[in-house]
From Swiss-Prot:
Domain Radical SAM core, chain residue ranges per copy: 47-262
An MF annotation (GO) of this entry: lipoate synthase activity
Top-level taxon of origin: Bacteria
Catalytic activity from the UniProt record: [[Fe-S] cluster scaffold protein carrying a second [4Fe-4S](2+) cluster] + N(6)-octanoyl-L-lysyl-[protein] + 2 oxidized [2Fe-2S]-[ferredoxin] + 2 S-adenosyl-L-methionine + 4 H(+) = [[Fe-S] cluster scaffold protein] + N(6)-[(R)-dihydrolipoyl]-L-lysyl-[protein] + 4 Fe(3+) + 2 hydrogen sulfide + 2 5'-deoxyadenosine + 2 L-methionine + 2 reduced [2Fe-2S]-[ferredoxin]
UniProt-recorded name of the protein: Lipoyl synthase
């Protein structure tokens, strides 16, 4: 039976007091995070632990996806000093694992690939021990851009599939097959590189559609997977169609692991970079943290 009202397991509280220190640090370095721009429900938990997913290439997106809270406007010029500021934050926070992502920049010839590569280089120079994960857009299928981020040699290179083919109309300008081909190309260019993707549940997908998407991902040898609950940022966004139970997420995780994914995070509050440091640890999944009481 589908649940269409927000259930009790999705009542995690946000604590602004937990944000103050991190927001001062990020503001001082003129940096953005997807945690803030996407109104992530895990922001208090992650900021309390001094973790953040850095949003480079500005905070304005050129696409109009109906599920996303990132602002859609004509972006500003690329800030070439941004990689060094991200690296400074990584060093100050003493991060052992960092995730860097961006809005889609269809206005740029390379989609922002060069700045991704520069950011990897800056982090590696400032904090050589930090594991670097990139979560990149599709670069409009530009193979030179994909090759550029692969050549930067992040430890993990992610690109989110987001949903099943039937529902791809919610992804403005995106193409299901193009995203799969991108993940396949990454592995072809560097067979040792770990690829990662994420899907949102509750958009109206069927279980068989989800499992077919997982089979498609295994066919392109995708290594890591995240499955999380879609939560509409506002009433003007695409409405939630269903709230799968925590037990359903557990079952999906076991199904995905049985298909050959090396690590799967699956739960209502799972997001692409949630517990990112646990991928590749050999545990299969992390124990999810309880919702903070404050």
């Amino acid at each position: 039976m589908k649940i269409t009202r927000r259930p009790e397991w999705l009542q995690k509280k946000v604590s602004p007091a937990a944000h103050a220190d991190m927001e001062r640090l990020l503001g001082g370095l003129q940096l953005h995070t997807v945690c803030q721009e996407a109104h992530c429900p895990n922001i208090s938990e992650c900021f309390r632990q001094r973790q953040a997913t850095f949003l480079i290439l500005g905070k304005l997106c050129t696409r109009l996806c109906s599920f996303c809270n990132v602002t859609k406007q004509t972006p500003l010029a690329v800030d070439q000093a941004e990689p060094e500021r991200v690296a400074a934050a990584v060093e100050l926070l003493k991060l052992t694992h960092v995730v860097v992502t961006s809005p889609t920049r269809d206005d740029l010839a390379d989609g922002g690939a060069a700045l991704y590569a520069a950011t990897v280089a800056a982090i590696r120079n400032a904090s050589p021990q930090t594991k670097i994960e990139l979560l990149v857009p599709d670069f409009a299928g530009n193979q030179e851009s994909i090759a550029a981020v692969v050549s930067a040699c992040p430890h993990i290179l992610g690109h989110n599939l987001e949903t099943v083919p039937r529902l791809y109309s919610i992804r403005s300008g995106a193409d299901y097959r193009r995203s799969l081909l991108m993940l396949e190309m990454i592995r072809r260019l560097n067979p040792a590189m770990k690829t990662k993707t994420g899907l949102m549940l509750g958009l109206g997908e069927t279980e068989e559609e989800l499992f077919q998407a997982l089979r498609d991902l295994r066919r392109v040898d995708c290594s890591y997977l995240s499955l999380g609950q879609y939560l509409a940022p506002s009433r003007s966004h695409y409405p939630v169609q269903d709230y799968p139970s925590p037990e359903t997420f557990d079952r999906y995780r076991e199904q995905a692991l049985s298909m050959g994914f090396e690590h799967v995070e699956s739960g209502p509050y799972v997001r692409s970079s949630y517990h990112a440091e646990h991928y590749g640890t050999g545990t299969g999944h992390a124990k999810l943290s309880p919702a903070p009481a404050d």
